[in-house]
Amino acid sequence: MSIIEGKVWGTTIPLIQRPQIELHSIFVNAGGYCSKHCHQSKINAFYVEDGELEIHRWKDYDLVDVTVLYAEDVAIVPAGEYHMFKARRDTKALEVYWSELSLNDIERDVVGGMSQEYDL
């Protein structure tokens, strides 16, 4: 069972909530917008299923980009960047948060092989 969270701008349904990834289904009413905010360590992506969603992005105090997303469009906002969204019309979207993992996050003590080469 999903918990629907009411927002001033619409609703959000958390589908997956884990330490390094979150997935939310959001519905934003026409004219609705979220707070201007940033995430310290989360990267934020928006995928519009239906509707039109503006993604506003700032660098310091300067608005540097407004991207309009339509059905099947995606926008990614890096961690630490102020942003907000606003719906031009009723919009259904997926919002994904994740944190970067190191691709080289492995320390090998023994290299893999066949069992006759190494006695476990």
Q: Which ranges hold each PLM region?
A:
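Double-stranded beta-helix
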Residues: I3-G6, K86-L120
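A generic "binding-loop/recognition-motif" signal
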Residues: G32, S41-K42, E81, R89-D90, ...
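Short acidic-glycine-tyrosine-enriched beta hairpin
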Residues: K59-G80
